[in-house]
Design a protein with these regions (language model features):
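A generic membrane alpha-helix/interface feature
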Residues: 6, 20-21, 56
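C-terminal segment of classical bacterial N-terminal signal peptides
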Residues: 16-24
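Surface-exposed repetitive/solenoidal architectures
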Residues: 24-314
Length: 314
């Protein structure tokens, strides 16, 4: 009987010891949480990131708690302070919860392609971050032509996770010679992108030499893209284009994804155009994916070996 009572007392002490620790953890998370319900609060958050307040702050929680209309705002990406040599000085590394809300009428056009913004998107670059439940709706009409890693959600994502996001952003270049990327995430490095969708149409009508176009990622390095979809159309001169990703390198994977958007390569130069991926590098993998869109070759005049097209990969 004494042993049983002692066991019960020890169990009770253990429970009592755990309760305040759990409460403290919840209180600590709440204390570092930022709620955004207005455009002004979003811009204040962006300024705080630019000031370095979120550098390596992986416990920070930012919650978008309302739909926001950015009509009239000339967008500069969150975390857009770069040194003269192009090194990013400050960045976001916490958790950004979109909670299913939409940021609409986001116009990337005015500041895209300027020298001071080599990475561009809603976020410029994120490191060790989690971004989820966010819908971006807007446009980008190219007016500047410096090289840019452009992603509607993030220009560059390193050691990060992007999930349950939707991009409905049109990208249009009619006469500028551009280099870089266009996708939901421009350049994914050691990252995971899952349960995301691109609805935006991409159109590049000018010849390019080094440009990666993908519905979900432009360039994926040692990253995994899974359970994602593209329904946007792609009309392009770009050399590396895919419904899901422009190019896969270094152990990257695309799993359980599909694309139904129309793809239309242009010109007569070298093109790697695939329904899922433009270029598939050594050691990479595409599994359980399909392309069910139209491939329009009416404006494409390249001949073999410059003409590399495929329903899955270019």
């Amino acid at each position: 009987m004494k042993k049983k009572l002692l066991s019960l007392l020890l169990a009770l002490c253990l429970v009592m010891a755990l309760v305040p620790m759990t409460a403290f953890a919840e209180e600590n998370e709440q204390s570092s949480k930022t709620s955004i319900t207005t455009v002004d609060e979003l811009l204040q958050f962006a300024k705080a990131v630019d000031n370095g307040e979120y550098d390596d702050k992986t416990d920070a929680v930012v919650s978008l708690d309302a739909d926001l209309d950015l009509t009239g705002v000339a967008w500069t990406p969150i975390g857009s302070v770069f040194a003269a040599d192009g090194t990013l000085l400050h960045y976001f590394s916490g958790k950004f919860y979109g909670n299913g809300h939409t940021i609409s009428n986001l116009d990337f056009s005015e500041n895209y392609g300027k020298t001071e913004y080599p990475s561009f998107g809603f976020f410029s670059e994120v490191y060790g971050a989690e971004i989820s439940g966010l819908t971006i709706q807007g446009k980008l009409d190219v007016s500047n032509s410096d090289p840019v890693f452009f992603g509607t959600v993030a220009g560059v994502a390193a050691d990060s996770k992007i999930s349950d996001c939707v991009s409905d952003v049109s990208f249009t270049d009619t006469d500028k010679y551009i280099n870089g990327t266009v996708a939901m995430c421009g350049y994914a490095i050691n990252s995971t992108i899952e349960y995301c969708q691109n609805k935006g149409n991409f159109s590049v009508m000018k010849d390019t030499s080094q440009f990666w176009m993908g519905g979900i990622a432009g360039l994926a390095e040692n990253s995994t893209i899974q359970y994602c979809a593209n329904t946007g159309d792609m009309t392009s001169w770009t050399p590396s284009s895919g419904g899901i990703v422009g190019q896969l390198i270094q152990n990257s994977k695309v799993i359980n994804c599909y694309s139904t958007g129309k793809i239309a390569p242009l010109g007569k130069g070298t093109t790697d155009f695939g329904g899922i991926a433009g270029i598939v590098g050594a050691g990479t993998e595409i599994r359980h994916c399909y392309f069910a869109g139209e491939m329009d070759l009416s404006q494409y005049t390249a001949t073999t070996p410059y003409k590399r097209l495929g329903g899955i990969a270019g």
